[in-house]
Regions:
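Helix-turn-helix
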Residues: 3, 7-41, 45
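C-terminal peripheral helix-coil segments that are non-catalytic and often amphipathic
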Residues: 70, 74-82, 115-119, 123-127, ...
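All-alpha amphipathic helical-bundle segments outside canonical DNA-binding/catalytic cores
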Residues: 108-113, 130-146
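Hydrophobic alpha-helical connector segments
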Residues: 45, 49, 59-89, 140-147
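Solvent-exposed, amphipathic alpha-helical segments
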Residues: 3-10, 57-60, 150-157
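Amphipathic, non-transmembrane alpha-helical scaffold segments
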Residues: 1, 47, 51, 107-118
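Amphipathic alpha-helical segments used for helix-helix packing
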Residues: 84-105
Length: 179
């Protein structure tokens, strides 16, 4: 599943096949079909695994006695790792790009995954603003959407420019919301 996820992040869902996975792992296609009879099943499994990872991560953040800005910085690191890993895009960005061509099951899982991340960030921003750590115009929901869209866009732009574009984006986000 790791190989399939990496291919998805590099090429998009429509940019790889079971043959690409089997070639990378030096196995036969039948071995993959044994575990995932359809590519859709593999895609759904990748998204569900990502949701589980984010749930564990967000639980760990809830348990940390650190400020809201530090939690936001930890959130930025989730996206930064894609820039550092051979300039991959994040899972949300990869799936959103292919969304109209994804099977229905994957579309639904993608909606849920993106919604979970947006809700977590919205709550962080609302709580941080109520405690005076963040200051921004508009609702926390709108700000969360702006931040995630900016991070995903920065990851895309890095592919054709330089990794410093991601750092510049994060710097600008911080300057726009820090009290």
């Amino acid at each position: 599943m790791d190989t399939a996820e990496n291919l998805l992040l590099d090429r998009g869902y429509n940019g790889f096949s079971y043959r690409d996975i089997s070639n990378a792992l030096s196995i036969r296609n039948a071995s993959i079909h044994y575990h995932f009879s359809r590519k859709t099943d593999l895609g759904v499994a990748i998204i569900r695994r990502a949701k589980e990872r984010f749930a564990k991560w967000s639980e760990s953040m809830a348990g940390k006695n650190i400020g809201y800005l530090k939690k936001l910085n930890e959130f930025f690191l989730i996206f930064k790792k894609y820039v550092e890993r051979e300039q991959q895009v994040c899972l949300g960005g990869a799936l959103e790009t292919d969304f109209k061509t994804l099977p229905g099951e994957m579309q639904e899982e993608t909606r849920i995954f993106v919604s979970i991340m947006l809700q977590w960030l919205e709550k962080l921003l609302a709580d941080g603003r109520s405690k005076g750590e963040f200051k921004f115009v508009g609702t926390a929901k709108d700000q969360a959407l702006l931040i995630i869209a900016s991070l995903q866009g920065a990851i895309q732009i890095v592919r054709v420019t330089a990794p410093s574009c991601f750092a510049s984006t994060v710097k600008q986000i911080r300057s726009c919301i820090c009290a």
